[in-house]
Amino acid sequence: MTTMGEDEAPALPKKSPLPEKIDEADVDDDPDDKVIKIVVVGDGASGKTSICQRFAKESFDKSYHQTLGLDFFSRRITLPHEMQVLVQVWDIGGQSIAGEMIDKYLTGANIVFLVYDVTNSKSFENAVDWLSVVKKNTKSSETPVKLVLMGNKTDLEERRVVSVEAHKNFATSNDMMPTYVSAKTGDTVFLTFRQAVAEVLNVGLSRAEVEADIEIVQGSVIEQPKQSDASYARRSDQSRSTSVCSIT
């Protein structure tokens, strides 16, 4: 399997298999904070690291960075009733599917994001293998692990090769939360993280809160490429197939 990025790049120095230290956001842990561990898996080049960076740092890096083993991100978010949650994100390199550390990476996960590239059919086909690995290594978890199927690169709608129907059917048949994101534009990235965390903690998000997350992204986009009618129709269908948690 390849690793994330649009172009090939020289191999980078190998990282330690587990993080030696955590992000600065964890240094001043509040004992009252809830802590949620999200593990992000999927083929290389599907955009996993870009999604994590968009969530944790609200940025998008166009340059290629190969993930070897594991990258670690974290961010505090606020849910209704002033609930503070520390979200720890484990970004797993695409080559790790056959690695001996994959079980360690998945240990203690509350949520798993299975990411694929909507413009790459192979990354979607390989989702079956990734899901099998995830289920094998989380079956003994004390609490059920929430599974999320995440189609990335929706900003490249005109190059889509994985249909909305295939995405929805795969998610439904495997009891997964279906969602689409664009790491490049930020479209629904933060919302998806927030929804998944809220569902795990049994916290409902109001319609106003969901729409506020969407508006933040839309307000940051200066220019959107003009879409054909067919592209717009696919985009509308895609939006309807994206899960929205407990809107009251």
Curated annotation (Swiss-Prot):
GO terms for cellular component: axoneme; ciliary base; ciliary membrane; ciliary transition zone; endomembrane system; neuronal cell body; periciliary membrane compartment; perikaryon. Residues 239-248 have a biased composition (Polar residues). InterPro entries: P-loop_NTPase, Small_GTP-bd, Small_GTPase. Disruption phenotype: No visible phenotype, with seemingly normal ciliary structure, and normal transport and function of IFT proteins such as osm-6. Residues 1-30, 227-248 are annotated as: Disordered. GO terms for biological process: amphid sensory organ development; axoneme assembly; intracellular protein transport; locomotory exploration behavior; regulation of cilium assembly. A motif (Effector region) lies at residues 64-72. It is a peripheral membrane protein. CDD domains: Rab28. Keywords: Cell membrane, Cell projection, Cilium, Cytoplasm, Cytoskeleton, GTP-binding, Membrane, Nucleotide-binding, Transport. Changing residue 95 to L: Expected to give rise to a constitutively active GTP-bound state. Cilia-related sensory abnormalities, but undergoes intraflagellar transport, but at a reduced frequency compared to wild-type. Expressed in amphid and phasmid ciliated sensory neurons. One of its GO terms (molecular function) is GTP binding. PROSITE patterns: RAB. Transmembrane segments: none annotated. PANTHER family: PTHR47978. Belongs to the small GTPase superfamily. Rab family. GTPase. Intraflagellar transport (IFT) cargo that undergoes bidirectional IFT along the ciliary axoneme when in active GTP-bound state in amphid and phasmid ciliated sensory neurons. Targeting and function as IFT cargo may depend on the BBSome, an IFT cargo adapter. Does not undergo IFT when in inactive GDP-bound state. May in turn play a role in cilium structure and/or function in ciliated sensory neurons. This is Ras-related protein Rab-28. It comes from Caenorhabditis elegans. The gene is rab-28.
